[in-house]
Amino acid sequence: MGRTVVVLGGGISGLAASYHLSRAPCPPKVVLVESSERLGGWIRSVRGPNGAIFELGPRGIRPAGALGARTLLLVSELGLDSEVLPVRGDHPAAQNRFLYVGGALHALPTGLRGLLRPSPPFSKPLFWAGLRELTKPRGKEPDETVHSFAQRRLGPEVASLAMDSLCRGVFAGNSRELSIRSCFPSLFQAEQTHRSILLGLLLGAGRTPQPDSALIRQALAERWSQWSLRGGLEMLPQALETHLTSRGVSVLRGQPVCGLSLQAEGRWKVSLRDSSLEADHVISAIPASVLSELLPAEAAPLARALSAITAVSVAVVNLQYQGAHLPVQGFGHLVPSSEDPGVLGIVYDSVAFPEQDGSPPGLRVTVMLGGSWLQTLEASGCVLSQELFQQRAQEAAATQLGLKEMPSHCLVHLHKNCIPQYTLGHWQKLESARQFLTAHRLPLTLAGASYEGVAVNDCIESGRQAAVSVLGTEPNS
């Protein structure tokens, strides 16, 4: 009788793990268990009354590097090439990004000319920060906060404006708490290997082999900065679900896992609400803190390490305006915590993907709310109403982008505990978990955003690596 692998979590990580397991030459029996009634996790696309697409979660995927190429290969394998909407390298959404500081939008400098000129909100040309960076000695600590690292190497302005904003935009987190080693490993490794971020990025970490396809070659030739799908990014998990069903994968929806226990023969018993499953191996693609509550008593050290990986909430407010125009053209802007602790940033959806504006077309923007403002609200126990978030988002759009009219359409979603926080020492939590799994030979593999990357590409790769670990070899296509 063949092996049974149970995959916990039907987000993009669990779907990717199930996909690669199902494509093995002799695939195991795969059962995908999802607590909610839908698959895709935080990837969710909604069509508005005029046909416009609103992304409630991720809205674009970067094609760069080996991970970006592997995701494009997955898109091709699923037959979605004709649905891809690329943002090419010469597009304003690829070239222009902004910071909102001092009540005004400031374009981030690009190219050598931009680095040599004074560029508000920075008081000096960023060239000088780069020159300073080349002279700084290598850090001696095994980890450091993003703020400390950036301030030490690039100066206080870059730390408090650029890196603070970047941490809010990517992790909805605090740069004074997040780990440089885990959040931005390429920067950490560049300093460790080459003593300098700039030298490390210029010299690179060596070429990583990446797959090849017509879509990957097109993305390279046209220098895509990001891409989406015509009907929204949720087309990707939907196509994965269709593929899994065709491959005989059992998909259980609306089935929260109540507990995991080890049987005498070393197999798992996966307890569901009204039934149970037996598995030779479990891939967990659910949040680390959730998994920690399901583990048996004999895995208490593992549960402790996983429970320490926390996550923060983000309110996503999609707004559409008829007849309105943006003051600038670009991807969007980020807001440092010193400017507005509640508004993380605003994405100019219509600039990158006008094909999704609907008919008649309307200007779409997405306001991300979170940070210390939202954490304080959550801790106070006050009612987090849709009206509160909509008002806050409309005020931000009016103040920061001049969109003072009432939106024609608005969607508000509070994503509770959606972005894991890789705080200082995160790598030690991962090491503790790995050591326990190895020492006790537990048939359990960890995947998902809780561990080594929160972006869609990271999650898909995490699922693929989990499948490779279980199979012991790369699955055939």
UniProtKB/Swiss-Prot annotation:
Result after altering S350P: In VP; abolishes activity; impairs protein folding and/or stability
Listed result of changing G40E: In VP; abolishes enzyme activity; impairs protein folding and/or stability
Phenotype when changing H106P: In VP; strongly decreases enzyme activity
Record annotation: effect of changing V84G: In VP; strongly decreases enzyme activity; impairs protein folding and/or stability
EC number: 1.3.3.4
Record annotation: effect of changing D143V: In VP; strongly decreases enzyme activity
Outcome, altering G448R: In VP; abolishes enzyme activity; impairs protein folding and/or stability
Effect of L334A: Decreases enzyme activity by 86%
Catalytic activity: protoporphyrinogen IX + 3 O2 = protoporphyrin IX + 3 H2O2
Listed PANTHER family: PROTOPORPHYRINOGEN OXIDASE
Similarity remark: Belongs to the protoporphyrinogen/coproporphyrinogen oxidase family. Protoporphyrinogen oxidase subfamily.
Stated name of the protein: Protoporphyrinogen oxidase
Originating species: Homo sapiens
